[in-house]
């Protein structure tokens, strides 16, 4: 699973997921999977989508992951009363805003990339769209 090696603080406040995304263009590959909705992407979801894509393209071409889970999410154990401090870090998430390109792929035909991204999108908790590199 993806998670930071070191962090300045162990736990963070919940905060809000507002604003517009950075990284809205396909930079590395030829095709990309772009978020239409907003939400949290856990390390497990990132890995599940990566596996789905890799298996479909049978390890040809190259896949770039453009998101990294850098926010810790805490949970208190089941059947524990409220109070007594904040819970332990259970998993890590990446906050995604609309327009963010999450995955990129290159070195494969467009139809293969489109189908691989469709399979990956089924693993993600919000709507996505297929994009291609803009040639100027």
Curated annotation (Swiss-Prot):
Task: Give the residues annotated as coiled coil.
Answer: none
Q: Which Gene Ontology CC terms are recorded?
A: cytosolic large ribosomal subunit
UniProt keyword Coiled coil present: no
> Which GO biological-process labels does this protein carry?
translation
InterPro entries given in the database record: Ribosomal_uL16, Ribosomal_uL16_bact-type, Ribosomal_uL16_CS, Ribosomal_uL16_dom, Ribosomal_uL16_sf
Q: Name one GO molecular function term.
A: structural constituent of ribosome
Q: Which cysteines are joined by disulfide bonds?
A: none
Subunit = Part of the 50S ribosomal subunit.
NCBIfam families for this protein: rplP_bact
| Name of the protein in its database record | Large ribosomal subunit protein uL16
